[in-house]
Structure formats: structure tokens, C-alpha cells
């Protein structure tokens, strides 16, 4: 079985998202990535997810962990996974340069302490489910019902798409200030919860996951233009092995001390 995704197509999707999203804001990136992936047929969605996993796994080596520690004030297994999601979203050139030497990350506009993008690693899952939900809403007459009840809020199918996307990507956001918007949100959430589709991607992935030959073929294509990673231990002095990134972080720290944190700032 060949996966319906190539490295060039994968990175072209990432580039389209980067051209539209606020790349300092994970929420913005997730929404634009979701919208792009919703356009893909299911086999390409699976391929995109497999390519994402492959690139994320490839970036797992000690010096990259050190870079994550400098940028995010430490790391862990889960936090490092989330950091590599952010890394992928920086695009092919940035990813490749970081694979050559993680110190090259210093050339990027880095949102220090905010590059652990957990949600981006799950967007293929959400997009697959979103496709299923749109079909379900239409087939069961839910879409027509919602359009009748909320004509001021749902003026097109794009508005319903937005409502479903928000419940998938940001289910725990603050309550709406307008009663009608909150009621629409509550109904959309109810229909998603009762659809039985929330975890449909798990079944799809299990039934269609690539075999060893397909994985090997895919990865030989993906990694052909990437450097070979040498086995090494975790560096002891980050400032020595990643001097440019270390200096950039120190400069960022110094700049922050010049101003008091704004009210409500988390970190």
C-alpha cells in the first residue's frame, strides 16, 4: 500500500497555512490547518498524518531536546512532542536547517515559552472527524434544523463549518456573551457528542494504517534530503552547543525585565 501523500505536497500544505495564519499563535495556526486538511480526501488525510508523525519522530535527538529546553524553560516527553509540532509548522526550510543544527533556530521569530503546540499534532484527526460530522449533520437533517433556528448566525454552510470547527478545536473556550450564540454552541456540541463520531479517526487509522513496507517507502522519500543524525549524548552546557539560540533567549529575557508583566499575563 502506498500512502497518498508526498513530502512536497505535505510542505505545500504547511506553506499555505503559514501564508494565512498568525504564526505566533497556535490557535490561529490550528484553524487554518484544519481548513486546509478538510479539503483533502480521506486517503490523503491519512497520508498527511503519517508524514507528520515521520517528521516529528525524525527530529527526536539530544541536541533538539536542548533547543526545546532553551526555548521553553525545560522539557519533558510530552512537551518535546509538542515542541516538534511547532517545529514542523515553521516550514520545510526551517525544519531542514534545524535538523542540520538546532542552533539555526535562532534565525526564526520564536515565541519563547510558547512553542509547545499540542493541538497541531491532532488536526488531521479533527479534520477527518469534521468531514464525517458535516455529512452527518446534512444526512440527519441537523444542518437544516440549525439554519432555521439561527438564521442570523448561520447565513451559509461556512458559518456552520466554523461552529463545528470551534467545538472541535476549542471546546473549553469562555462562554458566549450573547444568549443566541451560546445556544447555537450548546446545540452543536450536543449533536457532536451524540453522533458517536468523536473518535472515528481511531478506527479509520487502525483499519488503514500503513504496513512496514509502506512506512519504509514513505520515509525513504521524506528523509532523502535531510542530514543523517549522529548518535550523541545530551549536551551538558547548552550555551556552548547552541550559542546563537542561547544568546537570543538571554536577550529575550533581558528585554522582558525592562517592562512589568501586563495584567493577566500567565508567564
Question: What is each PLM-predicted segment?
Answer:
Residues 31, 35-114, 170-173:
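Core of folded catalytic or high-affinity ligand/protein-binding domains
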Residues 256-267:
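Non-Sec secretion/translocation targeting segments of pathogen effectors
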Residues 95-97, 101-242, 246-248:
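Basic, alpha-helical nucleic-acid-binding regions used in initiation and control of genome expression
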